[in-house]
């Protein structure tokens, strides 16, 4: 399971996390981040890769719960049309929302993977709740100062952790 800021696995994008890949790790339920993992930030529709990935999980019988720090309106607008369960205002990296997602999945914690694009929310949340973590590259790099700063720190921490 993830430890601190170190993910268990890395993937170039959500499309690389196939049902077969998950099954090979013993995973049978997924907690997925929304913004910059399944969709562009603030988008109401998934990216092409996000839509294909959700369809492949559904077809493989692997349940997915989307967990986001966004508002109910934002997360519901994305998830309801896709028929995907969700937890809004999750409080990542703290455990409240992750625990709710685990309950919704109805799968033992050790058989769940959390997939997301950020060290300081997704990886820490998985680590805190002792859940397997797969870190993906973000769909797009945000351009605001805060996000550029945060991504620079994440890259530095990631390099340091790999050494």
Mark where each language-model region is.
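Asp-based, Mg2+/Mn2+-dependent phosphohydrolase catalytic module
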Residues: 2-32, 38-44, 48-163
